[in-house]
């Protein structure tokens, strides 16, 4: 696993201080927990305890890992009650989930009305995923509807061929069988700035407008999104125009790290068609 640049970590911390407060969790923090402000308290959740993580990720042998306070599946969070949390952090986690839409649904369940989800995913163009195709939204819907087992082996084959660069069919299948047998955590899904913006917009309707997109920006080689859980009785959320997201991608690449206070510039970049939040203090 590569090191995260200090500038990226600094920007993450600034966003967390702006948006996150109260009691929350971070899923899969490993050796890079999110820096939080003084009004936020966090517990760390992972699918293995420290010993299990050390076995599963031998490449992290030289790093200090955060303590695992709760052992749970970060996709389902079955140990957490509905509305128990003020916030949930999952950096570089969604791409590892087999059912990202179902994961967002479960994460929303675990936070209170007005609670926030803080996500970061790698931009495929700036990562080892650059040779892989973007995951279509229709594929994600099928994984949610039919279960991720339908596509699991195909994801591992793509990983073995395009990331591990194995080409012999017998070798590929043997490697796929091994990785699946140990439930190795690959990047099941791939996004860039354009497709991730579209991915967040379309599930809003698919999930009955359960959240607002409060923040979306480029942050070095990653894309950061902050979602706010809506009260079902509140007015419909602000529009987010996916057909303009190619312009949004160019805007983010130029202005992403300084989005707050640029609403007028952003509306111009998007042709005046959208009203996206420029950020609010945590409440």
Regions found by a protein language model. Give the residues of each.
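S-adenosyl-L-methionine-dependent methyltransferase catalytic module, highlighting the catalytic core
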Residues: 71, 102-108, 113-253, 257-261
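Hydrophobic beta-strand segment of the Class I
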Residues: 88-89
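Class I SAM-dependent methyltransferase SAM/SAH-binding core
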Residues: 22-77
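Conserved alpha-helix/loop element of class I SAM-dependent methyltransferases that forms part
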Residues: 2-23, 30-33
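Membrane-proximal basic amphipathic "stem/tether" segments
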Residues: 1-11, 241-283
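Hydrophobic adenine-recognition pocket in adenosine-nucleotide-binding enzymes
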Residues: 93-94, 121
